[in-house]
Amino acid sequence: MAADGQCSLPASWRPVTLTHVEYPAGDLSGHLLAYLSLSPVFVIVGFVTLIIFKRELHTISFLGGLALNEGVNWLIKNVIQEPRPCGGPHTAVGTKYGMPSSHSQFMWFFSIYSFLFLYLRMHQTNNARFLDLLWRHVLSLGLLAAAFLVSYSRVYLLYHTWSQVLYGGIAGGLMAIAWFIFTQEVLTPLFPRIAAWPVSEFFLIRDTSLIPNVLWFEYTVTRAEARNRQRKLGTKLQ
């Protein structure tokens, strides 16, 4: 840094474009859509948190699919090299190319994969309760609505054209279907073997593929263990 009282030529400053979203001043809808446009960042933070605390192989695989999807988006953008909307007000963007929209591709991958997971992987339709089915339907609609709103926000905020978000959504959906099939047919049979690796045991990485309802399983196991420890504690105090 320059010493006190001394002037120097201004340095070139650049924003962190990952979380840099601009919207028209005074536009409430644009303000809300700008926050929605940050949904991919929130999703990534959620995945990292889940992996740190759960360390489940399927969650790690899901995040790997999202990373691969981003790589495919970068490749397509640099092959097609279609610019962003002409006359856009934004000076700080991650790349000058806009086809396909990475936000749209990311959210549609996340939503379609989650949709397939809820209806094909969590195969409990024969004994599922009404509230379980209702929760599944509401969550699926919410995911699809989020993907649409994020895609719409990129057009509304003049970061992309409709065709760019449309093809981004198509690419993300196709990638989600392909990655879901690959995970089910190739990776899932390998999960028990991977979970048995010494490095996996060291980092407490686990495989819950054969457990249909992990939330209920963890709840019942935790409750049973807590009661067992309570009984042992009561016996010692007598």
Curated annotation (Swiss-Prot):
CDD domains membership: PAP2_dolichyldiphosphatase (cd03382)
Membrane-topology annotation of the record: Multi-pass membrane protein
What SUPFAM superfamilies does the record tag this protein with?
Acid phosphatase/Vanadium-dependent haloperoxidase
Record's catalysed reaction(s): a di-trans,poly-cis-dolichyl diphosphate + H2O = a di-trans,poly-cis-dolichyl phosphate + phosphate + H(+)
Tell me the GO BP annotations in alphabetical order: lipid biosynthetic process; protein N-linked glycosylation
A Pfam family? PAP2
Membrane-spanning regions, if any?
Answer: 33-53, 100-120, 130-150, 162-182
SMART domains named among the record's database cross-references: acidPPc
Q: In which pathway does it act?
A: Protein modification; protein glycosylation
Principal cellular location given in the protein's record: endoplasmic reticulum
Please provide, in alphabetical order, the Gene Ontology terms of the cellular component aspect for this entry: endoplasmic reticulum membrane
Is Membrane a UniProt keyword of this protein? yes
Which family is annotated? Belongs to the dolichyldiphosphatase family.
Name of the protein described by the UniProt record? Dolichyldiphosphatase 1
In its UniProt entry, the species of origin is given as Papio anubis (Olive baboon)
